[in-house]
Amino acid sequence: MALLQISEPGLSAAPHQRRLAAGIDLGTTNSLVATVRSGQVETLPDHEGRHLLPSVVHYQQQGHTVGYAARDNAAQDTANTISSVKRMMGRSLADIQARYPHLPYRFKASVNGLPMIDTAAGLLNPVRVSADILKALAARASESLSGELDGVVITVPAYFDDAQRQGTKDAARLAGLHVLRLLNEPTAAAIAYGLDSGKEGVIAVYDLGGGTFDISILRLSRGVFEVLATGGDSALGGDDFDHLLADYIREQAGIADRSDNRVQRELLDAAIAAKIALSDADTVRVNVAGWQGEITREQFNDLISALVKRTLLACRRALKDAGVDPQDVLEVVMVGGSTRVPLVRERVGEFFGRTPLTAIDPDKVVAIGAAIQADILVGNKPDSEMLLLDVIPLSLGLETMGGLVEKVIPRNTTIPVARAQDFTTFKDGQTAMSIHVMQGERELVQDCRSLARFALRGIPPLPAGGAHIRVTFQVDADGLLSVTAMEKSTGVEASIQVKPSYGLTDGEIASMIKDSMSFAEQDVKARMLAEQKVEAARVLESLTGALTADAALLSAAERQCIDDAAAHLSAVAQGDDVDAIEQAIKNVDKQTQEFAARRMDQSVRRALKGHSVDEV
């Protein structure tokens, strides 16, 4: 007997009601788009069957081309052919020029110091270039799926900061795409491998792409993907292998002129071809700029050995953060085209003591994971139990009195997350509070990074400590931060979304974490000193107000004792002796106890004046 299947409105899984979603791997060197079709995940090819789209855009006055056609124009029109734009996302022009001094583009700075690339199509920023790549991928998906996309999941390196993530979302919006979520690339790979092989335990995802390196330590258990720790370098990848090999070929060929962009591109193309060939062969013949020679795999390995070692040092730091040893790692997932280099696979295998997983094409695995996640988020799998937990790389907090940082969300907290903490006013009658949002691991403001400032006004004028302000930090699934401050009694509030124009480099993040450990003892002492100084200032300010109001309650001798104690506290508070300040505060408290009792009695008498015992 046939059964009639009934679904709630909007939740039908009928094929014609499926929403169209895609996962996009927006890579430094190549990009891909993937989708789930008929229950199967697949990357979508172009008309010629090519799945990879080179992340290259060639601009002309009358328009632009993306992908292979653009890459083919690179040698003839270098200044108008933009590649590896992902490296520029969220960075200042000064940072880009310091990191990549030989880029063949004509740069100009925007009013806030961000890069603008001068092309035949006009001045373009990295967001616009990225948007053109995303448009090409979206067009491929729409044509293949015979419809417009309802949403996309776009992957980003795990170490991308707020500015880089926001830039990626802006590029997607410019391309007309609805972003369901930004997803860390290693996490996307874990989704792909987790569903394919059903592994449970600690997994390391080693992601070496064209321009970025990420290492993530994840725990997979019962459908839950939890990122224990992340690390990496957003300015290290296969492109660096290419440039090292290109420089080596230049030396061998005796080419001294670096100003000829056409020769620069020819050298780079020869280096890329040689690198690919050396993954399968021990030697390769190179013919460039009239020079012919031979490059061996051993020579190539010598050139890149130091860079591979840098990736392994990042792996060691991530393992330490996660609290696991290399032998605790169940599997090592290899992601990114650069993991095809034999030396990389060999060194990674030696480090972790096991053969890395390469079952899924390392170029496609991230896009596959993103497509699976997009299919879930768009609503095609409402019953999915997969839970995804990412982490923030650095602690978030607020500046408090004395230049201290009060951490609200510690680093490696899983996101999305919201945490609230209550603060109070420092002075009598205070009606406004400045909120200074900080990022970092140190105890003092001067050693952390300022993210944003905003003010909460309209606080009721109460005695110091009388008003209560709740500050809420919220980090969404894309790693973007918003902060809200609200005075509890009135409900007055102010908020800000943190969107810095450009953010921290991975080296700076790693340095901040390292410094927090190196200076831990020193920072604790500095914090204790600052806290005692703040308390001393509070005590002295309260005492001044009390003496102004009720000095008549004291005899001359009593007033002198209090003045002496206050003067001593004021003097020692200028120094660095924590114990001396603490003792001076206790002495002021001792000398003012009788004064405080008399003030209390006086307040009670005033409150009861004119009232009978029965009324009380």
Curated annotation (Swiss-Prot):
SUPFAM superfamilies given in the database record: Actin-like ATPase domain (SSF53067), Heat shock protein 70kD (HSP70), C-terminal subdomain (SSF100934), Heat shock protein 70kD (HSP70), peptide-binding domain (SSF100920)
Function of the protein: Chaperone involved in the maturation of iron-sulfur cluster-containing proteins. Has a low intrinsic ATPase activity which is markedly stimulated by HscB. Involved in the maturation of IscU.
InterPro entries in UniProt: ATPase_NBD, Heat_shock_70_CS, HscA_NBD, HSP70_C_sf, HSP70_peptide-bd_sf, Hsp_70_fam, ISC_FeS_clus_asmbl_HscA
UniProt protein name: Chaperone protein HscA
Gene3D superfamilies: 1.20.1270.10, 3.30.420.40, Actin, Chain A, domain 4 (3.90.640.10), Substrate Binding Domain Of DNAk, Chain A, domain 1 (2.60.34.10)
Entry keywords, A to Z: ATP-binding, Chaperone, Nucleotide-binding
Entry similarity comment: Belongs to the heat shock protein 70 family.
Domain of life: Bacteria
One annotated GO biological process: iron-sulfur cluster assembly
